[in-house]
Amino acid sequence: MLAMNVLFITADQWRGDSLSCVGHPAVRTPVLDRLAADGVLFTRHYAQATPCGPSRASLHTGLYALNHRSITNGTPLDSRHRTLASVVREAGYDPVLFGYTDTSADPRRLPPDSPWLRTYEGVAPGFRTELRVTEAEEVYLAHLAERGYGRLDYADVYGGGFLRPA
């Protein structure tokens, strides 16, 4: 039996109501709308922790922050914790990352002169990195500008009475 492909999308600081498929009046997300129509759209997802780094660590490990202990941005993720990417790799998948996870490497597993000790912008274990955000941001923004898409003003996205309770 052929294994199914899985597309798992996470976004940093992206409000759940900022998709056109859920009725946002200014944001247009046609590709994501099609994916949501053919897949699974979690309309009541809540982050386990704040800020973003600990929240991602919880998402990637399935653990509460008090268990994985990565409680601030830049706190390394203990290498004893298995990540979703590692588990699916063991199952025969090839988890590929486009973007970032901002997961600090466990310093106990690195040599003292490792460049990964100077940043918390690492990649969670198990992923094969295809394209990092830092490599693609300007190219992507230029691609959008060529097609007439600019950056929305904060008030366009969050104003206008669109905010509503969950």
Model-predicted regions and their roles:
Residues 1-49, 89-90:
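Active-site-proximal N-terminal segment of extracellular/periplasmic enzymes that hydrolyze or transfer
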Residues 4, 29-31, 50, 54, ...:
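Proline-centered helix-kink/hinge sites
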Residues 11, 21-23, 39-61, 76-77, ...:
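Short, solvent-exposed turn/loop segments enriched in Gly/Ser/Thr/Pro and often Arg
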Residues 15-18, 23, 42, 55-56, ...:
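Glycine-rich, flexible loop/turn motifs
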Residues 30, 54-55, 72, 79:
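A conserved catalytic-core signature of glycosyltransferases
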